[in-house]
């Protein structure tokens, strides 16, 4: 039943849009050197799987700024990647969360290290810059002591310097930005895991980029890690805004558009428009679901499990489904599973296609079959994406307005809901007649859009995602009887140029009774 539902959702998504041609999605494994103990066996296993990419993490330590970690291992392994036609990606990140922000010289040192890597391994053409900098485990500080976000604005100059450094060595190098975590609580005063959501992190990178007046891009692709929120969540469950998962990739694309549209940084191609040659692509370079260890193999693992695991059959289904799902997204260039082989400590990752004894899980066969069947292509017309110019999920309920309101009425209110944070400006507007003419509506909309205009009984505020907001106007009487309307303009917090406006039906305010003589 789960498989039928997932495939049906993929088909419906494909049929719902006018698609565009896209290059095939490629598949890979996020695994450092040492898996299976031998590079020939490792890359032969990737060939058997149908995986053509291997993302390798390289941690830069400012205490040894020119030392390439595990260089003998890389020198031993990487030639086999070339022999087996496996594309290697280096994911280069600071070894400690405060390495970049603790000294003004660190960005230049990091950029110089990237150039050293590029000259040492000229056949490696893909670099991921950083690893989940929206998470405190990998980047600190996330916020200032007053609660202002710092991580996005501090990461932007690192990405810019990295782009320039790598392109200076070889313009054909593919620079992959960010490597975003799908999560983030946006709470600078949280008890733990003080982190930044992916949508807000991209927004802050964009603000810093625009402020820098940079005339060159920051990245060629965007790295994103669409892990589930809870390990036992199915792939299509996703996240609420401003987080994102497998089914929320359009949310990431919109965040990029909000952050960079109109700048030198390319955004994602859009449905119905000719895709520019340099349109941004998604590199989904980490995802995985952890599984329960069979009793006969538990002696190979150490420690205690720290997540709710799924069974191996469910993992196999999820992985196969994901291959098919991303194959129908023309903006995805690649997907990599984390890992090929389990990690030994149970509080780490047992998400591999192989168990710790190197035996194959059912997911190995399911992924192999899915790659072979799809070839990274969509069975139907691939869906496309286009940016929205409005506020996602915005609705307004003005309530019943069919009865006249008394001259002494002081209660003016209605409700609005949104699926992303938004600011609002609202008020009451006088009409010249009982009808809301096109001219009158235009005047209301113009007043709402003008920051200097002051509607009758005006109010401003913030509507939070997924929470019904009571828009309460000042408790005053209207001086004149006649016909009125409510009006509200919502502006997206991530891009105030995206707006939603709504005007109520006209309602009558009765005149004050004449005093008896």
Per-region residue spans from a language model:
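Substrate-binding cleft and catalytic face of glycoside hydrolase catalytic domains
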Residues: 46-192, 229, 289-292, 343
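Aromatic/hydrophobic beta-strand junction motif of beta-rich domains
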Residues: 398, 412-420
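Short, solvent-exposed loop/turn segments at the edges of extracellular beta-sandwich modules
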Residues: 491-498
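Aromatic-rich peripheral "rim/lid" segments of glycoside hydrolase catalytic domains that contact
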Residues: 41, 45, 65, 133, ...
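Boundary/entry segment of secreted carbohydrate-active catalytic domains
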Residues: 22-59
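Noncatalytic carbohydrate-binding groove/subsite architecture in carbohydrate-active enzymes
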Residues: 40, 106-111, 150-309
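Short, acidic/polar
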Residues: 33-48, 106-117, 197-211, 313-325
